Curated annotation (Swiss-Prot):
This is Fanconi anemia core complex-associated protein 20. Keywords: Chromosome, DNA damage, DNA repair, Metal-binding, Nucleus, Phosphoprotein, Zinc, Zinc-finger. Residues 1-17 have a biased composition (Basic residues). GO terms for biological process: DNA damage response; interstrand cross-link repair; translesion synthesis. Its main location: nucleus. GO terms for cellular component: cell junction; chromatin; chromosome; cytosol; Fanconi anaemia nuclear complex; nuclear body; nucleoplasm. Residues 1-28, 106-135 are annotated as: Disordered. It holds the Pfam family UBZ_FAAP20. Changing D164A: Abolishes binding to ubiquitin. The gene is FAAP20. The keyword Glycosyltransferase does not apply. The UBZ2-type zinc finger binds both 'Lys-48'- and 'Lys-63'-linked polyubiquitin with preference for 'Lys-63'-linked polyubiquitin. One of its GO terms (molecular function) is K63-linked polyubiquitin modification-dependent protein binding. A zinc finger (UBZ2-type) spans 144-180.
């Protein structure tokens, strides 16, 4: 009887928020210059409330669509046996650890300009193809000289990936517990 008195709960669809406010519901990267800078300053204040933005606000990081574009990457051709393959290399990593923006300096929350915080070195050319680097061979005291499961000797020219691959294969085929 008590269940009959309770109202039934039901699910209802969420109504979209009305497109109000200064931005009109447009994404930040499509806004005009002044409004975009105001939102950027507001974001910086939100991240660090003790921040004082009386002076110039650090420049806004470039949106991926605003970065300079270059033509199609040149294809590299290589031959394996009788077949010839073409390959387009990946572009270089433009946002690696040396390219990050450091806007806040220390615990005090003082702003730094991204240009002052980055080391002074030439920016990488986004149109330049990356160099293929050889992986160093396994050397040193920590390197295994042979497989602990099958006792196969590892050649000194093998890379760490080759050694790890062999160890994984041996471990997968093994039915014994191995203590390292």
């Amino acid at each position: 009887m008590e269940a009959a008195r309770r109202p039934r709960l039901g699910l209802s669809r969420r109504r979209p928020r009305p497109a109000g406010g200064p931005s009109g519901g447009r994404p930040w990267f499509l806004l005009g210059g002044d409004e975009r800078e105001r939102l950027w300053a507001e974001l910086l204040r939100t991240v660090s409330p003790e921040l004082i933005l009386d002076h110039e606000v650090p420049s806004l990081p470039a949106f991926p669509g605003q970065e300079p574009r270059c033509g199609p990457e040149p294809t590299e051709v290589f031959t394996v046996g009788p077949k010839t393959f073409s390959w387009t290399p990946f572009p270089p990593d433009l946002w690696g650890p040396g390219r990050s923006y450091r806007l806040l300096h220390g615990a005090g929350g003082h702003l730094e300009s991204p240009a002052r915080s980055l080391p002074q070195r030439p920016a990488p050319d986004p149109c330049r193809a990356p160099r293929v680097e050889q992986q160093p061979s396994v050397e040193g005291a920590a390197a295994l000289r042979s497989c602990p499961m099958c006792q196969k000797e590892f050649a000194p020219r093998l890379t760490q990936l080759d050694v790890d691959s062999h160890l994984a294969q041996c471990l997968a085929e093994s039915t014994e517990d191995v203590t390292w």
